Regions:
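A beta-strand signature from Gram-negative outer-membrane beta-barrel systems
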Residues: 12-14, 65-106, 202-204, 217, ...
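N-terminal periplasmic accessory domains that precede
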Residues: 5, 30-36, 87-109, 178-186, ...
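Residues on the lipid-exposed face of transmembrane beta-strands in outer-membrane beta-barrel proteins
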Residues: 36, 95, 107, 207-213, ...
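Outer-membrane beta-barrel transmembrane strands
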Residues: 197-216, 223, 307-337
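Extracytoplasmic beta-strand/coil segments of soluble accessory domains associated
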Residues: 6-50, 69-70, 79-96
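Surface-exposed loop/interface segments of Gram-negative outer-membrane beta-barrel transport/assembly proteins
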Residues: 25, 100-188, 225, 229-323
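Outer-membrane beta-barrel channels and translocator barrels
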Residues: 2, 100, 202, 213-214, ...
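Periplasmic plug
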Residues: 28-76, 108, 114, 121, ...
Length: 337
């Protein structure tokens, strides 16, 4: 599944640098440079789709990759014909054209599995408690320090929990004074990157009908994309619908008319709290994903980020685009197109 044609070109074209700042579906933050990332005057390339300049390279995200016939890149002298806007180069996109003949129906579909790659290695419970102990003792705190006592308790109770109101309580007063505002303590060895992120699936379906005669040809295409995010909590996806119609009509031997119409509608959903989830520090490894009965867990004023994503609401963005391009071709002299 190719959600954005730019993703298919990464590393495929010499001199073309394509970057992205996020893996969020529909919000990848693509950046394109033809001249190179070290250019003094770095300018975004001019995107031209079927002869019509686009508002920016971001419009590539609205294109159905199955509709694209060719993509060409121009820079320096070859891009000069497009003027000052082409200072960063030109990306020429040509969509598919029909052939005269019998009606042709084509379908393509794909299912892609996203696999989370490199993740930062998080501290284990033992490493975290050792770090807390070393830091506090290095700063001159003694064994009666709240954090020193808490770290030693966490190391001793790793994989278990304490409930001050009963249940599993190894001591009448095991908790340091600075932590007594919390009734329960959990010391699970939790890797929060594995909790928050995981594999995801994307699906794509494309259907086209084309054909015509020597005088008139047509191509109608429909596309559907469902791109799921790797965040395992809350709603995080990009759903896109595409429709494109091309029709050429030969009025006479010298005059022809081309109609190129396209429309897309994109639905993006992301957790409202995703900014704080990504920007906040990962909780200490002892906190659990949920309570014993599967409800959100909080430790004092600390809320685990998975439930912020799950229950914090959604941000929804709907992007609708429509383009109509009419071209009247007049062949004034024989041999000139």
């Amino acid at each position: 599944t190719v959600a954005n044609p730019l993703s298919a070109m990464q590393g495929q074209v010499p001199g073309l640098r394509i970057t992205r700042s996020s893996a969020a579906p529909g919000e990848e933050g693509w950046g394109v440079s033809i001249r190179g990332s070290v250019s003094k005057n770095k300018v975004e390339p001019l995107l031209i789709i079927d002869g019509v300049p686009a508002s920016g390279v971001s419009e590539m995200a609205q294109l159905n990759a199955d509709d694209i016939e060719t993509i060409n890149f121009l820079k320096d002298a070859s891009a000069a014909i497009y003027g000052a806007k082409a200072a960063g180069g030109v990306i020429l996109v040509t969509t598919k054209r029909p052939d005269a003949g019998k009606t042709r129906v084509e379908y393509s579909g794909s299912v892609t599995r996203k696999i989370v790659g490199l993740q930062p290695r998080m501290m284990s419970m033992d490493e975290w408690t050792d770090g807390v102990l070393q830091a506090r003792l290095n700063d001159g705190y003694g064994e009666d320090d709240n954090w020193v006592r808490y770290a030693r308790l966490a190391k001793a109770m790793k994989g278990s929990w304490i409930n001050l109101h009963g249940g599993n309580n190894p001591d009448e007063d095991p908790i340091p004074g600075g932590f007594r505002g919390v009734a329960d303590f959990v010391f699970h060895d939790m890797n929060w990157t594995d909790v928050l992120w995981g594999n995801a699936t994307s699906t794509q379906h494309n259907l086209s009908v084309s054909g015509g005669s020597e005088k008139s040809t047509y191509r109608l295409s429909l596309g559907y994309l469902n791109d799921q995010g790797t965040l395992q909590w809350g709603n995080n996806s990009n759903e896109r619908y595409n429709v494109r119609l091309f029709n050429s009509f030969k009025i006479n031997n010298r005059i022809s008319l081309e109609t190129n119409m396209s429309a897309s509608r994109q639905h993006q959903v992301a957790p409202t709290q995703i900014g704080s989830i990504l920007g906040s520090s990962i909780p200490q490894p002892g906190l659990p994903v949920s309570t014993i009965d599967g409800k959100p867990y909080a430790w004092g004023g600390i809320h685990t980020p998975n439930w912020s994503a799950e229950l914090g609401g959604d941000n929804k963005l709907v992007v609708t685009t429509m383009n109509v391009n009419e071209i009247l071709k007049v062949n004034i002299l024989d041999g000139l197109d």
